[in-house]
Every structure is written in structure tokens, then in C-alpha cells.
Amino acid sequence: MKKVMSLLFLSALAAPAFADECTLTVEANDAMQFDTKALSVPATCKEVTLTLTHTGKLPVAAMGHNWVLTSTADFQDVATAGMGAGPDNNYLPKDDARVLAHTKLIGGGETTSISFPTEGLAGKDLTFFCSFPGHWAMMKGSFKVG
């Protein structure tokens, strides 16, 4: 009985730890930089919640940022196509299946969050980036599941 109680106690402590591993925070600034070049979550995460905070002061029209996830093979084509999509579409091609997840564009002092499933992403070569025109070449990084 003592062992069962100990296991129950430990499993109760482990649940929040697993939840935290599936929650990511990224900051972007007015210098066109994310605060990280690599993000990862364990394969045990069925869903990821990502929060993007724009720590700068410039408005969305001048220095907007978002967070977009694609396969690395699709990254450049999606980023290029997004430039023509305009700000109303978050500089992303509308309904493009190559976009695996994305936040909306935000300006200085703003925060946005998204949640997305990880099914089928484990072991894939993935890239995250900002699709605001001119940003994607500098504001990018790798994303790994597992």
C-alpha cells in the first residue's frame, strides 16, 4: 500500500512537468530576432502550446512578427509566397497545407498564443520563422518533436 501511495504521489507531480515540456515561449524584438534558434518538445507531447511575445515597441505595420512552422523543405517557398499574401493574411498563403502552425502578426508589447497537434511531426526536419516581409531570412530556427 505504501508503494502504491508513493507512486500515485509521484505521478501527480509528474503530470505538470510533462505539461510544461509541451509549452514553449518565444520572444521577438525590434532588431528582427527571435530569442532562440532551436525549439524542441518530447515525443510524449500530443499538443504544443506556443506563446509569442513581441518585446519591442514598434507597431505591427512597421515591425510585425509572427511564428510559422513548416517543413524545412517548404520553408523558403512558403515565406516567398507569403510576401504577396499581405498583412490581412499574416503574410502567409491562404489555406496552404504546407503551413503546419502559425500565430497571428503582432506588434511591440503584444503577445499571442497557439496550440497545435504534434501528430506526424516526430523525426521530421522542421523550420519555424517570421513571415513578415524581409524577416524570414534572419528570423528562423529549427523545431524538433522527439
Regions found by a protein language model. Give the residues of each.
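Sec-dependent N-terminal signal peptides
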Residues: 4-13
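Sec/Tat signal peptide C-region and signal peptidase I cleavage site
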Residues: 15-19
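Extracytoplasmic/periplasmic copper-protein system
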Residues: 20-29, 73-92, 133-146
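N-terminal edge beta-strand
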Residues: 21-47
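Short amphipathic, basic-aromatic surface patches that mediate peripheral association
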Residues: 52-57
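Short, hydrophobic/aromatic beta-strand segments
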Residues: 59-66
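Beta-strand signatures of extracellular beta-sandwich domains
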Residues: 66-70, 129
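Extracellular/periplasmic metallocenter environments
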Residues: 101-146
